[in-house]
Amino acid sequence: MYPENYKRFLELIDKLREFEGALIVEGLRDEVALRNLGVRAEIIRLSRLPLSEVALIASSHKEVMILTDFDKKGEELAKKLLNYLAGYPCSVDIETWKELRKLVRKDIKGVEDLYGLYLRVVSVSDPLLEGIQ
């Protein structure tokens, strides 16, 4: 990731921390990484349930954020989830995933790697980034 993107990356991490809806991820390691980042929202893992059931559980929240991995498989899962969630009255955030993917996909492949990338960014951050954590 280019240094000029560090600030936006950290802002997106803060957005994840502050999110109060349901976050949909692929697996346990993704959930662990998000918890390490300080995310407190309910996390629903795709590895445990069929997509239709995940969508039903997630739809009980007003807001749902899709946070699949940043590879081709993750992109396909995100599209399928959007289709499943389209029939429910919840608000679905896919834009955060798209922006994160654009920023990090050359550095990492999955959500499970976000915490490690976060630690690297914070360790090399300059004074302009102080206060954003």
From Swiss-Prot:
Q: Where does Mg(2+) 1 bind?
A: 26, 69
What residues does the Toprim domain cover? Answer: 20-100
Co-factor note (free text): Binds two Mg(2+) per subunit.
A GO molecular-function descriptor? metal ion binding
Query: What is the residue range of the signal peptide feature?
Result: none
- Do you know which Pfam families this protein is assigned to? Toprim (PF01751)
Where, by residue number, does Mg(2+) 2 bind?
69, 71
Cofactor(s) listed? Mg(2+)
Alphabetically sorted, this entry's keywords are: Magnesium, Metal-binding
Family of this protein: Belongs to the UPF0292 family.
Q: What is this protein called?
A: UPF0292 protein TK1411
- Origin organism lineage: Archaea, Methanobacteriati, Methanobacteriota, Thermococci, Thermococcales
